[in-house]
């Protein structure tokens, strides 16, 4: 959810969250949306966020997608006015994911809920340590921390990462590859 708020063209993130929690959006519907985006050469979000395109789908799927689009648009409206921790908490509440985990009552759901609370705590810590705390900076810091935790000490290797993730790291050789959608 957080990645999609920062970059609505991130179709991979969109596909991961479109039906989480369950909204009655099936694989066939997702494939039709993806096909339409590919055919029109536009990001998947533009198709998902187009009420006319969505209304042409089956009733339950259309309702789920319209609800999802409404949630994302509301969350994006808070992007500039809310702190990273507030945004994380807002995403958990508005998406319905936190409520789904609470009502599931399983050990796995409880573990996920604790992990999400750690995410909120990490956002709070980031805010305390950063003067101009924003969601994009928090996600970058979290990605760098995660990469550093998993860092392999082998010296003869290639590390693939985004340019944004590489900020502040030192490498003897850096190769930049440009890719554009469409």
Role assignments for model-derived ranges:
Residues 1-182:
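Conserved helicase C-terminal RecA-like lobe
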